[in-house]
Amino acid sequence: TYAHAIENLTNYTVYTHGEAVAMGMKMAFNLSLKRGFVDNNYYNQAIELIEHYDIAPKGAVFDKEKFYDEMFLDKKAQDGKVRFVLPNGHYSVVIVSDSSKEQVLDSLGL
């Protein structure tokens, strides 16, 4: 969901697909932490792993409102809600569609 918004907002020209996915993974972990699905230790391990391989460009600048609106164009959006597949502990995910706009905007880290 996050990666598709990144790719669409940049017209697939600024970041590779892998970079967009890695950036999106960090955002998903941010949301998961804010929602209480993962603890700080697991969150930090995941972020450190992504950053260790230097696959998520830093310093990306997006308009948060445009980014949020773009997420509703994703194939996972249904009935006016954005569905997120979020980490929920080791080797586990949860699918949610009840994240508030504030939670999502905060998760962007922009």
What residues fall within each predicted segment?
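C-terminal charged capping/lid subdomain of soluble metabolic enzymes
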Residues: 37-110
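Active-site segments that bind and position negatively charged phosphate/pyrophosphate groups
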Residues: 1-62
